Amino acid sequence: AGVKYRLAVPREGYRAWFGGLSLSRHAQGPVLDAAYAYLNWWLSGWPGAVMARQGYYIGNPARSRDHLSSAEWDYWYAGQPAREELLGSDGLPLIDIGEVRDGGSYEQRMGHIAVWNSVMDEHNYLVRRWGDFMRARST
């Protein structure tokens, strides 16, 4: 039993945010090697697939495609109806057959961003309200 909801698809455009990784100019030797290994892991595809199963995107989606089933790719990136039940990153059912992602395909969603933020002023408030919503959804 869950709460029925629908995400807003504002006519004016989405507000999006981006988090990135970078290296300190002071990193050297084994620390620098470990930092590059970590960055490369993020770009390897598997982390992006895990993120996709939570509804998020990664900067190099093509690398994630090999780690998603064709049904997952079609739902999360192509904007098509789910042709099978899809699991979330926790392995539990998340998307029902026939469900369509609000906002369309990756290209449609990315093409409709009006404002980019790094961290919104409302972030802490929204995280608390999202937690409230998720707790209500599970009862």
Give a label for each model feature:
Residues A1, W42-W46, G55, W130, ...:
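Sec/Tat-exported extracytoplasmic proteins
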Residues K4, F18, D33:
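Active-site lining segments that contact anionic ligands and/or coordinate catalytic metals
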Residues R11-A16:
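Short, surface-exposed loop/turn microsegments at beta-strand edges and helix-strand junctions
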Residues L21-R101:
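Mature extracytoplasmic/periplasmic domains
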Residues S89-T139:
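Conserved C-terminal helix/tail region of periplasmic/extracytoplasmic solute-binding proteins
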